[in-house]
């Protein structure tokens, strides 16, 4: 029965760039300023036409009919009000603008939208992720062969020993995959392997000056105690071999 491992190579990751959509003039919603400007423009045109009509009627019909005298005063007033509305709508709300100004504004708008950056879409995963105007950094994972297992380190941790070479009963010896060699724990230059090092002061002192039998016996006992204290424990006591 084959075991399938979910590795990153099994899921291809596709990255492609998406150009941001530039809304056209028709897609932009009409604002309140545009509505007010359009109202003033058409009102000014209408009042201007009415003012011109009244002015012409007053100057033409004034000689024959006296009822058109008021048109000489009302016509110029309506004409001036209509021209004022038209100027306000053109200057303040920019209802009537030249083609060159319109092209310049569209170029500025396009440059502002382009400076925001492109959109990147990541597919090949559970849910596609889209980044708008973000900086994409490519991440190359390390090879799997160089990763060490999360378990115990391969280096051996030596247990804590007391001066007599005994393992403390309170702490347990760390389990290792393979126990170390005996000479790595107790090298040959240890004081326990050198026979003359434990009691050499006492032997040298006996040759230099005469001493009594009690001093020699005491020195011999101390040498034996030190030898027992510094003697290494058996290998089977430290690391029990698996059975």
Curated annotation (Swiss-Prot):
Gene Ontology cellular component annotations, sorted alphabetically: apical plasma membrane; endoplasmic reticulum membrane
InterPro entries xref list: TMEM174
Membrane-topology annotation of the record: Multi-pass membrane protein
Signal peptide interval: none
UniProt superkingdom: Eukaryota
Biological processes annotated in GO: phosphate ion homeostasis
UniProtKB keywords: Cell membrane, Endoplasmic reticulum, Membrane, Transmembrane, Transmembrane helix
Membrane spanning residue stretches: 40-60, 73-93
Main location: endoplasmic reticulum
Disordered: annotated segments: 205-229
Cellular compartments annotated: Endoplasmic reticulum membrane; Apical cell membrane
Any Pfam family matching the protein: TMEM174
Subunit structure of this chain's protein: Interacts with SLC34A1; regulates SLC34A1 internalization by PTH and FGF23.
Function, in words: Regulator of plasma phosphate homeostasis. Decreases serum inorganic phosphate (Pi) uptake by regulating the sodium-phosphate cotransporter SLC34A1 trafficking by PTH and FGF23 in the kidney.
Name of the protein described by the UniProt record: Transmembrane protein 174
